From Swiss-Prot:
Belongs to the receptor-recognizing protein gp38 family. A motif (GRM 2) lies at residues 124-131. Keywords: Host-virus interaction, Viral attachment to host cell, Viral tail fiber protein, Viral tail protein, Virion, Virus entry into host cell. A motif (GRM 6) lies at residues 188-194. A motif (GRM 7) lies at residues 200-207. A motif (GRM 9) lies at residues 222-227. This phage use outer membrane protein ompA as a receptor. It holds the Pfam family Gp38_N. This is Receptor-recognizing protein gp38. It comes from Enterobacteria phage M1 (Bacteriophage M1). InterPro entries: Gp38_N (IPR048291), Receptor-recog_Gp38 (IPR007932). The lineage of its organism: Viruses, Duplodnaviria, Heunggongvirae, Uroviricota, Caudoviricetes. A motif (GRM 3) lies at residues 151-164. It is found in: Virion.
Amino acid sequence: MAVVGVPGWIGSSAANETGQRWMSQAAGQLRLGVPCWMSQFAGRSREIIHTLGADHNFNGQWFRDRCFEAGSAPIVFNITGDLVSYSKDVPLFFMYGDTPNEYVQLNIHGVTMYGRGGNGGSNSPGSAGGHCIQNNIGGRLRINNGGAIAGGGGGGGGGYWNASITRYRYRYVVGGGGGRPFGAAGGYSGGSASTAGTLTGAGIGSKPGNAIYGGNGGNVGSAGGAFGGISGSRYGGGAAGYAVIGSAPTWQNVGAIYGPRV
């Protein structure tokens, strides 16, 4: 809801909107300085505030749904635990151009928001890491970053080792490591296994021979490593995801950033 327009019962409407009977206090809830005219209350809304704790498999559609529930009212998201997107293909936090709010305030309280890590390749390139924030509302998105914003690390490159040209007669699919965080490991067919990324580190590539290895996954904001070997098909690692992609927000505090940003 919002305070009614002029003409209308602005005083009672402002009290219902803000929960404040004193108009000086209602003005504060509506982000107006005192003194002010009550007519300035018309059409304004109090901030809608949400707080989120840790979730390592988070669907960013939740943010979008809360924005549309609030209508044109300004909305505040307080992040108090590490958040990781559920998919490398979906940004953790996305504000498309049709977002209706007066502004969107994102406060990060000493924690990290992550795009998901890219997958390691299986006789193929590593996939790109996921973006953390996609912003298409320009300065209406206000970011106060008291923690970190991290693009997902790229997946490591895989390959195919044709060992028959050496003194061995085996052929191996070589897998790349998953990017940080939680990028899946690439497939492999021999030697030490490739590993997935975790919240705290990137995965490593498989290793079928002393000089043959899949690329390691990238750390947050970094590309994955390339396949290393002397024969067979060799592929590169995936690119890092963006910390913030799209249009530039209003940066109230940039904080720690891992990966490209606008």
